[in-house]
Amino acid sequence: MKVDIYRREGPQQKFSYLIVPQGQDIPPEADNVDWHVRQLAVDVDETQEHLHPYEIDNPRAQIAEKGYAITSVYHQVPAQAAP
């Protein structure tokens, strides 16, 4: 699946990632924070249980349910490891 990848910095210099199917807007319920485009039209295997290096769990299920998939607060990426 081709997706657009957004990133935002959280507390303690850790990053969260949000992916949406290519060309789709971030849904309104997730658009209230400062997301920055990281990459556009990236091929990812959304069938994976865990999408590394963005640390997103169950991307296919999240996209089906919400229209996007996001890094859990438990898996935020430290700045030195952030893609």
Question: What residues fall within each predicted segment?
Answer:
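Structured loops at beta-to-helix junctions and adjacent beta-edge loops in soluble globular domains
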Residues: 6-8, 22, 73
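Short, extreme N-terminal segment that most often corresponds to the first beta-strand
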Residues: 1-18
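Intrinsically disordered, low-complexity peptide-like regions
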Residues: 2, 23, 41-43
